[in-house]
From Swiss-Prot:
The keyword Oxidoreductase applies. It is an enzyme of class 1 (oxidoreductase). It comes from Amycolatopsis orientalis (Nocardia orientalis). Its EC number is 1.13.11.80. This is (3,5-dihydroxyphenyl)acetyl-CoA 1,2-dioxygenase. GO terms for biological process: antibiotic biosynthetic process; fatty acid beta-oxidation. Keywords: Antibiotic biosynthesis, Oxidoreductase. Substrate binds at residues 184, 190, 223-226, 234-239, 293, 322-324, 413. Homohexamer; dimer of trimers. The lineage of its organism: Bacteria, Bacillati, Actinomycetota, Actinomycetes, Pseudonocardiales.
Amino acid sequence: MTTDSPTLSLSPGLDHRALAKAAQRVDELLDGLPSPSARTPAQREAASSALDEIRAARTEYVEAHAEEIYDRLTDGRTRYLRLDELVRAAASAYPGLVPTEAQMAAERSRRQAEKEGREIDQGIFLRGILSAPKAGPHLLDAMLRPTARALELLPEFVETGVVRMEAASLERRDGVAYLTLCRDDCLNAEDAQQVDDMETAVDLALLDPAVRVGMLRGGVMSHPRYAGRRVFCAGINLKKLSSGDIPLVDFLLRRELGYIHKIVRGVATDGSWRARVIDKPWLAAVDSFAIGGGAQLLLVFDHVVAASDAYFSLPAATEGIIPGAANYRLSRFTGPRLARQVILGGRRITADEPDARLLVDQVVPPEEMDAAIESALAALDGDAVRANRRMVNLAEEPPDGFRRYMAEFALQQALRIYGADVIGKVGGFAAGSR
């Protein structure tokens, strides 16, 4: 078994054929090695050296040809491919640029510590596409379009006003879409299923003409520590990250560019000339806590009500990953000093302290939550509210700024989830409650 890194002989300005041949040689090296955790130091060095070189070449290639690649994959930007569809199309049309479906299937069968880290190559590709001035905005638009699952469920929801899914349920009452996180066994910890259910629910709420306002709240838990109590969200499911079941494309990126971005911008349609999207006001209600991804969500809602015994945290430093788009949004609410304390230092903010009012609009006793929610929903119900929240969001979060952030996030988060520190930390967390 060789431990020599292949000589790739890559030169600046390489064409796709040369890139594909070099990628094949790297794959042959990796296929001949044991799994990452079983490699000798020499084997690790050989793999790392080869991957560094091919990834530098992939970066150069996609940065030079992003618009051309995207135009080919989308027939001149006439087709709207979602993230997962785009990376699969790229794997077929540009061998060696991103991992093949077979390679990704093999990765999905392994724990995080046993993976080769091929999602990093997807991150390189998506950073290049999102950074491109024409391709990037088109990809954002593609991710704002309703999902096929939502379109299939829409007639049922319009008729009955109820859709129940594994991780979320949606009920329409008096013009309000009540969206409830209902993973009662794991404190609403986030995984790919939750992201799929949440995007479906957000699409339905936005597409249903009878819905005027949306509301998100955590359901009642069966988890022993919070049995009988409502919980908003415990953040990313660290057990699933350790087991290799938190994907870059279908969770970490889809979450940001899918349902969260739709809460901000609305769902894209081919309808009225008045607006390219259907958007509506949203309220969040926080019981018990909003940790990690739960706290990130609060930054995109128009009104937040919290119980006085709740708390908020972004434990990025503890978990080792990037807290979604919180690094982009949080300082607008808190200022840069407090944002750094929360993100870099892991500061927890309780609802009863003054700084909490930078994150939430109302703090009420737990027994008054229902009344406060209904009052706030009534205040959000109006055409003028909808028009003004659209303009506020446009001013506070210009699409190009968000796109540039997400371009870099695509790669940096991919690198983080394969960092040795993250793999070690989540392995320890896996024995905990999430």
